[in-house]
Design a protein with these regions (language model features):
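Short helix-capping segments at alpha-helix termini
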Residues: 68-74, 98-99, 129-131, 156-160, ...
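A general structural signal for well-ordered alpha-helical segments in protein cores
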Residues: 27, 59, 63, 88, ...
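Active-site beta->alpha loop and helix N-cap motifs at the rims of alpha/beta catalytic domains
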Residues: 2-143, 153, 297
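C-terminal alpha-helical cap/extension of soluble enzyme domains
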Residues: 3-14, 37-39, 197-200, 204, ...
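Catalytic alpha/beta core domains of metabolic enzymes, predominantly
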Residues: 126-128, 139-247
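Short, charged helix-to-loop "capping" segments that act as catalytic/coupling loops
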Residues: 15-24, 156-161, 258-264
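Residue-level "edge-of-site" marker
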Residues: 47, 82, 108, 139, ...
């Protein structure tokens, strides 16, 4: 297996229902559940992890926990994106100290920047960590699309650049990024199989958090050359993604994981809203219909 490929769930950040702060024990449980299911790595403190709602201490602690809990069994790609270069550098330096395998970063957002400013931002952040860098292409949230043309400028200036998570609607660009020699994760779990066929090296998204087995089946079938089985697996996995689209990612993922693992992952951080009791019941019934039932997570290996 290459350094980075396969299924990398964008992991949630469980919150304490009492304090609203990071629930470290639940975070470790969610990691361990996914590791034992067979995932290849994690995308940590990204959009699914409510990154822009975390303070610096929480972000830094999450990096430490991720590295400690994985203990080299999988690879962690830690999100260090921020609106300012100074803050992103500080988060990148901490990620490197924590011992994660790579960093990822959205472009600077809110204020529109020139291509030159974006390139310099990535150069400075990557140099601070000196780890493999994955660009986080999420224009729906950042207002900035990393086009192949802009990516070429970043590639020319940033020696640490490894690849990207491509969550933009421009699906054909996956092929262009692959032709550039970049490791391109598709950022939509609905498109894992078609993306693999045009050069993606895996999938990073939120729904695999609570149902890693569904997307691992796609990965295994595709790599075995069994496209029909992969198509069936993609259809089944997509039902879980559509559940998230109907009820909201953060609340839905936390409800299902809480039920499957027998823990409390809390609610989305405000202004995010929890699901009503009625909606929780619908989500859990639909999850059970997909076979997403209670699992036992063994103690992680020392």
């Amino acid at each position: 297996m290459a350094d980075f490929e396969g299924l990398f769930p964008a992991i949630i950040t469980p919150m304490s229902r009492d304090t609203g702060k990071l629930n470290e024990a639940a975070f470790r449980e969610v990691m361990e559940f996914n590791i034992q299911a067979g995932v290849h790595g994690f995308w940590v403190a990204g959009g699914t992890g409510e990154s822009v709602l975390l303070d610096d201490d929480e972000n830094m602690r999450i990096a430490e926990i991720a590295a400690d809990q994985s203990r080299g069994r999988i690879k962690n790609i830690m999100h260090v994106g921020a609106a300012t270069t100074e803050r992103a550098i500080a988060l990148a330096e901490n990620a490197a100290r924590a011992g994660v395998e790579a960093i990822c970063c959205v472009p600077p957002f809110f204020y529109r920047q020139t291509d030159e400013a974006i390139v310099e931002h990535y150069r400075a952040v990557a140099a601070a960590a000196d780890l493999p860098l994955f660009v986080y292409n999420l224009p729906q949230s950042t207002g900035v699309e990393i086009t192949p043309e802009l990516m070429q400028k970043i590639q020319d200036a940033v020696p640490q650049l490894k690849g990207l998570k491509h969550s933009a609607p421009s699906f054909p660009n996956v092929r262009e990024f692959a032709h550039m020699g970049l490791d391109c994760f598709i950022g939509s779990s609905l498109l894992m199989l078609p993306a693999l066929t045009i050069g993606a090296i895996g999938c990073v998204d939120g729904p695999p958090n609570f149902a890693p087995e569904l997307w691992l089946e796609i990965w295994d079938a595709y790599n075995a050359g069994d496209i029909k089985r992969a198509e069936v697996a993609q259809d089944r996995a997509s039902e879980a993604t559509m559940l998230v689209r109907e009820f909201g990612l953060h609340a839905t993922a936390k409800v299902i994981l809480s039920e499957r693992l027998g823990i409390d992952c809390g609610d989305p951080r405000a202004p995010g809203r929890p699901l009503s009791k009625e909606k929780q019941a619908i989500v859990l019934r639909r999850a059970e219909e997909l076979g997403l039932t209670r699992v036992a997570v063994a103690q992680g290996d020392d």
